Amino acid sequence: MSQKKLTIYFCGSMRGVNANHQNYQTIVQELSKYGEVLTTHVAYPEMSNKLEHKMNDKQIYERDYSWFTESQVMVAEVTAPSHGVGMELGWASLRQNYKTLCLSQKEKEFKTSGLIAGCPTFEYKEYQNQEDIVAIIAEFMKQLQ
């Protein structure tokens, strides 16, 4: 990727009970160093609730798909199972030359789907702590240059 500021689509479980918003916030903060994160609200439940309070499901879909089409890369936190994240990863898998990083905690309740961890167009990485998140994102972004 060139020196032009990246547009980044971040996704993670929002309605699920296992969302780790502290890790999401670390991810969004790190991604913000490399470009514009179109979906920062995912990391902040109070912001998300405020944004989506008056939106119906179709409006949420249309908004998110629009952000996806504007983005140049995707970073997905896939530790907690999520239908929405699966949908977003489906979009990413069908888009040519679209770089996608999937992050998952090493110690977790659920095993990541082989359709995500084994997808040849995704970079799948596991982390143990926030320092790992920072290092993985830095390496991913370095590869884009």
Curated annotation (Swiss-Prot):
Its EC number is 3.2.2.-. Pfam families: Nuc_deoxyrib_tr. Keywords: Cytoplasm, Glycosidase, Hydrolase, Nucleotide metabolism, Nucleus. GO terms for biological process: deoxyribonucleoside monophosphate catabolic process; nucleoside metabolic process; nucleotide metabolic process. It is found in: Cytoplasm; Nucleus. One of its GO terms (cellular component) is cytoplasm. InterPro entries: 2'-dNMP_N-hydrolase, DNPH1, Nucleoside_deoxyribTrfase. It is an enzyme of class 3 (hydrolase). It catalyses: a pyrimidine 2'-deoxyribonucleoside 5'-phosphate + H2O = a pyrimidine nucleobase + 2-deoxy-D-ribose 5-phosphate; a purine 2'-deoxyribonucleoside 5'-phosphate + H2O = a purine nucleobase + 2-deoxy-D-ribose 5-phosphate. GO terms for molecular function: 5-hydroxymethyl-dUMP N-hydrolase activity. Substrate binds at residues 9-15, 24, 41, 88, 113-115. HAMAP family: Nuc_phosphate_hydrolase. Monomer and homodimer. Belongs to the 2'-deoxynucleoside 5'-phosphate N-hydrolase 1 family. Catalyzes the cleavage of the N-glycosidic bond of deoxyribonucleoside 5'-monophosphates to yield deoxyribose 5-phosphate and a purine or pyrimidine base. This is Putative 2'-deoxynucleoside 5'-phosphate N-hydrolase 1. The lineage of its organism: Eukaryota, Sar, Alveolata, Ciliophora, Intramacronucleata.
